[in-house]
Amino acid sequence: MQVIIPSAKIVSEDLQNLGRLPAIVYPVNQRPVFDYLYKEYVGSDFRVITFENSKTVEQRLSDYENVDVLKLDKLGDLGTSVYAGIKNQSGEGIINFADTIVEDNINSVDGDALFYSEDIPSETWTFFDDNDGRIIRVVDKKRESTVNDNLEKLFVGVFKLSHLEYLQHCLYEALQEENSEISSFYRAIMKYSEKYPFKVIKTDKWFDIGHADKYFSSQLEVKAREFNHIKIDKDRGILTKTSDNVDKFIGEIKWYLKLPTDLEYVRPRIFSYSTSYNSPYVSMEYYAYHTIHELFLYGDLTKNQWTDIFRRIKFIYSDFQRYTVKDGSKIKAALKDMYLTKTINRFEKLKQNVQFSKFFTDPISVNGKKYKSLNEVTNVLKQVIPDKLYDIDQFNIIHGDLCFANIMIDNNYNFVKVIDPRGKFGDFDIYGDPRYELAKLFHSLDGKYDFIIKDLFNINYDLENAKIDYRINDRVRDVDLYKLFVDVFEDEVKGNLQKIELIEALLFLSMIPLHGESIRQQLAMLGTGLDILNRVVDITI
């Protein structure tokens, strides 16, 4: 199946807080719109029509298979984009607007079809009337002179056509016409339907990404659908969360509750909760903020915007340090538990996976560099962790999982909220090693954790020979975010870089058995962890 996606324009100004992005690469719940369409029409050939900021689309879609990005010579109306996309195409095809996600699959419908929804006529959408699938009237984003409070059909932006060559003919004729209030695309659709009537199908699973108010509503609904343990009351703006991982979840709830009053600004407002082991839950205020994870992967922010973000994070990091605890023996036990014991236990769990057998016994090749086996690395860690990390006797309040996905920021980059805290560091609850917080941030900026968990990397591997060759598909940016972050956190990083990198390496090495659903991700994490560890201590052979 051929899928044509017109995406010639950037999103409207009220959605440009992430940058001047075309809709096709705009994020919805931590995934770009194209990712939803790619999975919706799996196995299809895609043609994305671009003009404004086309380079960004080319870069972001370069690692998808069977995707052709076509740049227009000049910007025209919607019909111009579609005409370029279907030129020299014939047979069946799907046209899916770049700002439209519909969970119903039109590909399963025989013949010509289109999806519609209903609303009161307005300038927001294009409305239509049909007679047995023949489009007889179109109101193209124009407010009619007469007041009409009745619901009318509107195009959501998904069409299946059985004869692309005839649509091309209809578009050619429509593009020759002048001074029409109706887009050439819809004039062509009207003419096409005279010969090939549509099955006009109502959908309730339509997410509109093209308008700010609808975008945030769509983001909310997609989030609720994709996470089984989250329910969102849209009317009240309340998110209720449950979890099967009861111990961890209760620790999370208690972290929210134990925060000192003057630090509660960092968390969502809590309305109700239960820490009952049988049915724990928490209901909290829902924020339609983007996560730093989304900004990092999909945003197009300036250096000044990133500086503001990092300064906001630094303020919270520093503010947490107003609350400290000292208990030498208990702190040392917590450090050992979190850094050494946990890593060794995770390695023991990984050993049970036969796919990793050779990695424990044989030298490991990562991008051509030879490292010691994991059995030997284990012995190295038993020496280097106590030497470098057992040197503090004071903890302060920490979040415990301060990765980019757990940090939300408002559209003006002024207010930060943190979610999904760990709630446990050894035998401590809200207290822990502040270097652990920095390592969590490093593992996004330095180790590219966010790219790995979204499969934004290339990898070849040979399990029998313990060989990994991988490359993270990092973003092309005008600013070095790692350097910018280190500059903002200069005082915190100075003198601690190797210790932070050691903890960062341990994060990658200890998370491998937790990602058993993807051997690719596991091996990318292993390669990354060994590369970072080698900066701290020589593990080459």
Task: List the predicted regions and their residue ranges.
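Conserved N-terminal catalytic core of the sugar/cofactor nucleotidyltransferase
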Residues: 2-13, 19, 26-95, 177
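Conserved alpha/beta core of the MobA/IspD/sugar-nucleotide pyrophosphorylase nucleotidyltransferase superfamily
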Residues: 3-6, 152-235
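A glycine-centered beta->alpha junction motif in the catalytic cores
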Residues: 9-12, 276-309, 315-325, 353-361, ...
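ATP-binding glycine-rich loop module of kinase domains
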Residues: 227-258, 285, 292-302
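Conserved kinase catalytic-core helix
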Residues: 259, 295-357, 374-391, 491
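Active-site acidic catalytic loop and adjacent metal/ATP-binding pocket
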Residues: 379-432
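Active-site activation/catalytic loop segments of kinase-like enzymes and analogous catalytic loops
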Residues: 422-488, 505-519
